[in-house]
Curated annotation (Swiss-Prot):
It comes from Chlamydia pneumoniae. One of its GO terms (molecular function) is large ribosomal subunit rRNA binding. GO terms for biological process: translation. Part of the ribosomal stalk of the 50S ribosomal subunit. The N-terminus interacts with L11 and the large rRNA to form the base of the stalk. The C-terminus forms an elongated spine to which L12 dimers bind in a sequential fashion forming a multimeric L10(L12)X complex. The gene is rplJ. Forms part of the ribosomal stalk, playing a central role in the interaction of the ribosome with GTP-bound translation factors. Pfam families: Ribosomal_L10. It comes from the Bacteria. The keyword Metal-binding does not apply. GO terms for cellular component: ribonucleoprotein complex; ribosome. The lineage of its organism: Bacteria, Pseudomonadati, Chlamydiota, Chlamydiia, Chlamydiales. Belongs to the universal ribosomal protein uL10 family. This is Large ribosomal subunit protein uL10.
Length: 170
């Protein structure tokens, strides 16, 4: 039994070190169907959900030299490890939580080498994603260019209209 726990601890330590970030969750009223649906939704954003024993997770955090506020860890503990953008994973958790009537509670998280409280993780999840921000910036640059093109197009069509009218009079 001791060897199994050691292997599990090593596996969790490896996941923590390989992940870009993680989100600590408490799950409530979580059926097998919800769990499968949740895991499938996370796979689209390069994240995975693990149900872990608290003691093993906290030992792995300690071994990794990380600090995470784990003061409110009553109930079942689940961790979302994000190998991609941790904000996208947080958004996915928030979306799933809205669809399934608050079956998940944000406890804490770690993103970009910063420890976050549950409320902070939830606030980050409500922000626009990196992809959405890029689209907004491109839109900001593209809007003036499209206006210039529209003005030039209307000037050219006005010139052509004048030439057509002059040609029609002769």
């Amino acid at each position: 039994m001791k060897q199994e726990k050691t292997l599990l601890l090593q596996e969790v330590e490896d996941k923590i070190s390989a992940a870009q970030g993680f989100i600590l969750l408490r799950y409530l009223r979580f059926t097998a169907a919800y769990s499968r649906e949740f895991r499938n939704s996370l796979s689209g954003v390069s994240a995975e959900f693990e149900v872990l024993k608290k003691r093993i997770f906290f030992k792995a955090i300690e071994a990794a030299g990380l600090e995470v506020d784990c003061s409110d860890t009553d109930g079942h503990l689940g961790v979302v490890f994000s190998c991609g953008d941790p904000v996208s994973a947080a958004k996915q958790v928030l979306d799933f939580n809205k669809q399934h009537k608050d079956s998940l509670v944000f406890l804490a998280g770690r993103m970009d080498n910063a420890s976050l409280s549950g409320a902070e993780v939830e606030a980050v999840a409500k922000l626009p994603s990196l992809k959405e921000l890029r689209q907004q910036v491109v839109g900001l640059f593209a809007a003036p260019m499209s206006q210039v093109v529209g003005i030039m197009n209307s000037v050219l069509s006005g010139v052509i209209s004048c030439v057509d009218q002059k040609a029609g009079k002769n």
